[in-house]
Regions:
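N-terminal cap/lid segment of alpha/beta-hydrolase-fold proteins
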Residues: 1-37
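Short, surface-exposed "cap/lid" segments of acyl-processing enzymes
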Residues: 36-39, 43-66
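Catalytic nucleophile-loop/oxyanion-hole region of alpha/beta-hydrolase
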Residues: 54-64, 75-106
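C-terminal catalytic histidine-bearing segment of alpha/beta-hydrolase fold enzymes
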Residues: 86, 196-239
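Glycine-rich nucleophile elbow surrounding the catalytic serine of serine-hydrolase chemistry
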Residues: 111-121
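Hydrolase active-site cap/lid region
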Residues: 121-162
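Short beta-strand/loop motif that positions the catalytic acidic residue
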Residues: 175, 181-183, 187
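Conserved alpha/beta-hydrolase "acid-adjacent" motif
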Residues: 188-194
Length: 239
């Protein structure tokens, strides 16, 4: 089986136009990538990395900058990634969204992988207009059973997934806002059935799903990929 294309991690880092703090931790920051014309909804971008401390927001900087270059203001959120303390990550994402909502009234959440998980959960607690989840971890019980990323769920939760249903998108009610899941058939990091099963369970007028052949996990956040225009199209349809 071929490995995932991780070349997105090799793209040059692009500095934000502005960085603000929403808490005292060095991880409680938001990077802003801003277009000249800020008439569109704010995209709140949440990175993945299986909630692990070694993966931060910087690998999403090229994606954020490319969105800004197509006219979307972007808030790239960092959050604390503390082993065994999932509430720190979720509360940080919620608080960061609350911070940007002081200036922007129309927010679209985009999360990738573990960031997609956090976006789907946080959307129950914040005032967002829509969610786009890219290869999201929608089912913590299944991820735990499959031992994805060598025990990532156990490390994240510090407890069995069965004890934290409020953190599991599959076990939460369907969202009342437009929710779009996007997944690549060749994803080796988060099996595509995570999105397929979630959409089947939460079926309704607010739930949309796109899957792409010959696409893996990281192409979804690579601004050079064929998927980037599709994400821009979905954003436009939601704004």
């Amino acid at each position: 089986m071929a490995d995932e294309d991780r070349s997105v991690f090799d793209l040059p880092y692009i500095s934000p136009a502005e960085t603000i703090h929403y808490g005292k931790s060095e991880d409680q920051v938001i990077d802003f990538y801003l277009p000249k014309d800020q008439k569109k909804s704010l995209v709140v971008l949440i990175h993945g990395g299986y909630w692990r401390p070694e993966y931060d927001r910087k690998h999403l900087a090229p994606f954020a900058n490319s969105l800004a270059n197509t006219g979307w203001p972007v808030a790239l959120v960092e959050y604390r990634r503390i082993i065994g303390n999932p509430d720190a990550a979720l509360s940080d994402v919620i608080n960061a969204i609350g911070e940007v909502s002081k200036k922007y009234s129309n927010l679209i959440l985009i999360g990738h992988s573990a960031g997609g998980h956090l976006a789907l959960v946080a959307a129950h607690e914040v005032n967002a207009s829509a969610v786009i989840a890219l290869a999201p971890l929608t089912n913590l019980l299944a991820a735990e059973e499959l031992d994805l990323d060598e025990g990532a769920v156990a490390d994240f939760l510090g407890a069995p997934a069965s004890l934290r249903p409020e953190l599991d998108p599959t076990r939460l009610p369907a969202l009342s806002i437009p929710t779009t899941l996007i997944h690549g058939v060749l994803d080796l990091r988060v099996p595509i059935d995570f999105s397929r099963d979630y959409v089947a369970l939460k079926t309704g007028p607010n739930v949309n799903y796109l899957e792409f052949e010959n696409v893996g996990h990281f192409e979804l956040i690579d601004p050079r990929s064929e998927i980037f225009p599709e994400i821009s199209r979905v954003l436009t349809s939601l704004s």
